[in-house]
């Protein structure tokens, strides 16, 4: 089993992801379905240039590689990334003192940032910043600079910023060992209280909150070789430049330098907190090699079980997940809803599109009773909606679902994969808007899937036939007539299709049965047809043994 380890707000280094064998994925040729194809790894490989041989750069006390104090403008990080990509990849060597390098999880948690030392705390600004110490999984030295009036000032490590509890017996170092990341605070929920808004820590991972949310899914700067048998490559944000916010602004801007053996990149994040926190991302990639297995705007989440399929799960909680579905608005004007699954074997699905309008991992179930978890509160986890800026052309929204037996593992990944590889030596620009929160997508006059459940079709005796129940919620007035229901499958036999009003949900319930026959993987598609125009989600599902 391959998964991403979750340690509360922590994300792992790339060493926790190992090579994996792909399960066979079903390829649909019928235009009646959103296309789900086999992973590219199972197709004839396109020759690519091997990454330049990496060299090692030893540590230098108090060395500042990227965030040197000096003039800074909007093009500074782009120039750095371009220069970085023109040279072979360098494995940076910044070893920690032995005591910090071998910290346990509890020991690492015992090193806390002192809120009194928060950046801008004494200036009355709408944002504050706190840094994370290095140690545990977070061995990489991350440089940070503060930008004000086009001047960048390197933020050196200071042991006085941190407090160490009883678990830590040694003194913190005095050398500039850098940081492992940082978090931004804002009066997101209550005036006068600076709550966490956003975190950057671990590889290129980051995550954010809308009003009233608790941390759940994460985003990354870039995905490379996800679900590749040779192993995934994890780029890292090596340095950040954080612009000092204005007194009267609801905006904070973060610049980041990305690096990995295959690519360097420059990122700009414009963050606006709110009920749904909005982050505008502008990125420029400088590939060292051809990027044929690249994912733009990647998100990482967790799905353990729900009414959709529990796989004999022995758990008092009805549902356990950070996200319960992948929502897509494609270039043809369709709205597609694909419930997530915790499969028995690795599944990779590719939904082909041209000029996508939006996609994201959504936590649609907001009722505490559906989770019954007094600590995790999965009903508070944010959804993340990605809106491409400009025409992203041809490609596919790729969904990877990894088997897991524990909620501590992230097992869901989604991203946009361009149809054409990104050439080595090129400059590739793209931009998108992220919305983090309970309801990041407008639902005016729409019919959306609110619940998916499945079970044995005959409760009196064992049968391979499956019963599917799909509930739809109607936003707006309910018409007098029932919609027509259309259910299709790539195999097996569909029977007993029934559509009924659901007064409890102000919507409809679609029920049907599937006889798998000799199939072990079947793609399903359901649509509701109304006599008057309205936006209706198309339900997609992959059934497997």
From Swiss-Prot:
Keywords of this entry: Periplasm, Signal
One BP annotation, GO: beta-glucan biosynthetic process
Signal sequence annotation: 1-34
GO MF annotation terms: carbohydrate binding; catalytic activity
Superkingdom classification of source: Bacteria
GO cellular component: a single term: outer membrane-bounded periplasmic space
Ranges that cross the membrane: none
Pathway: Glycan metabolism; osmoregulated periplasmic glucan (OPG) biosynthesis
Ranges for region Disordered: 38-60
Compartment annotation: Periplasm
InterPro entries per UniProt: Gal_mutarotase_sf_dom (IPR011013), GH-type_carb-bd (IPR014718), Glucan_biosyn_MdoG/MdoD (IPR014438), Glucan_biosyn_MdoG_C (IPR007444), Ig-like_fold (IPR013783), Ig_E-set (IPR014756), MdoG_OpgG (IPR023704)
PANTHER family: GLUCANS BIOSYNTHESIS PROTEIN (PTHR30504), GLUCANS BIOSYNTHESIS PROTEIN G (PTHR30504:SF2)
Reported function: Involved in the biosynthesis of osmoregulated periplasmic glucans (OPGs).
Family statement: Belongs to the OpgD/OpgG family.
Name of the featured protein: Glucans biosynthesis protein G
Taxonomic source organism: Shewanella sp. (strain MR-7)
Lineage: Bacteria, Pseudomonadati, Pseudomonadota, Gammaproteobacteria, Alteromonadales
Gene assigned in the entry: opgG
């Amino acid at each position: 089993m391959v998964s991403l380890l979750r340690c509360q707000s922590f994300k792992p280094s790339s060493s926790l992801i190992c090579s994996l064998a792909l399960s066979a994925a079903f390829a649909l040729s019928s235009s009646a379905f959103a296309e789900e194809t086999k992973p590219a790894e199972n197709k004839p490989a396109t020759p690519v240039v091997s990454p330049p041989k990496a060299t090692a750069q030893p540590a230098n006390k108090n060395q500042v590689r990227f965030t040197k104090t000096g003039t800074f403008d909007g093009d500074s990080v782009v120039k750095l990334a371009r220069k970085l990509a023109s040279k072979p990849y360098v494995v940076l060597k910044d070893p920690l003192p032995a005591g910090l390098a071998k910290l346990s999880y509890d020991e690492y948690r015992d090193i806390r940032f002192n809120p009194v030392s928060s950046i801008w705390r004494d200036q009355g600004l709408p944002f504050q910043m706190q840094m994370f110490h290095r140690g545990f999984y977070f061995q990489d030295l991350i440089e940070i600079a503060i930008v004000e009036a086009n001047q960048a000032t390197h933020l050196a490590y200071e042991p006085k910023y941190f407090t160490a509890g009883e678990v830590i017996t040694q003194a913190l170092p005095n050398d500039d060992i850098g940081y492992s990341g940082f978090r931004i605070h804002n009066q997101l929920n209550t005036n006068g209280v600076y709550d966490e808004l956003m975190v950057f820590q671990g590889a290129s991972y980051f995550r954010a909150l809308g009003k009233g949310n608790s941390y759940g899914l994460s985003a990354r700067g870039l995905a490379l070789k996800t679900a590749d048998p040779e192993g995934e490559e994890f780029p890292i944000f090596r340095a950040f430049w954080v612009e000092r916010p204005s007194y009267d602004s609801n905006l904070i801007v973060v610049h980041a330098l990305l690096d990995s053996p295959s690519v360097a990149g420059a990122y700009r994040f414009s963050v606006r907190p709110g009920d749904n926190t909005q982050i505008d991302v502008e990125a420029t990639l400088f590939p060292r090699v051809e990027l044929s297995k690249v994912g733009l705007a990647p998100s990482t989440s967790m799905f353990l079980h729900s009414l959709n399929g529990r796989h004999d799960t022995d758990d008092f909680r009805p549902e356990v997940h950070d996200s319960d579905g992948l929502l897509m608005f494609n270039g043809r004007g369709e709205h597609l809803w694909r419930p997530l699954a915790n499969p028995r074997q690795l599944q990779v699905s590719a939904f082909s599109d041209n000029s996508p309008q939006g996609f994201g991992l959504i936590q649609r179930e907001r009722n505490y009773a559906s989770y019954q978890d007094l600590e995790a509160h999965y009903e508070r986890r944010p959804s993340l909606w990605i809106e491409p800026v400009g025409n992203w052309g041809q490609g596919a929204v790729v969904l990877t679902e990894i088997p897991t037996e524990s909620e501590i593992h992230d097992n869901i990944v989604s991203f946009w994969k361009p149809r054409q590889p990104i050439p080595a030596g090129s400059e590739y620009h793209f931009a998108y808007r992220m919305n983090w929160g309970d309801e990041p997508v407008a639902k005016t006059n729409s019919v959306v899937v609110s619940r998916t459940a499945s079970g044995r079709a005959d409760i009196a005796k064992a049968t391979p036939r499956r019963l599917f129940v799909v509930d739809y919620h109607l936003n707006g007035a309910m018409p007098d007539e029932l919609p027509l229901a259309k259910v299709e499958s790539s195999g097996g036999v569909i029977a007993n299709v029934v559509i009924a009003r659901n007064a409890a949900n102000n919507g409809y319930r679609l029920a049907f049965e599937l006889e798998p026959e000799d199939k072990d993987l079947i793609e399903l598609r359901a649509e509701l047809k109304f006599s008057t125009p309205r936006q209706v989600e198309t339900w997609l599902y992959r059934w497997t043994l």
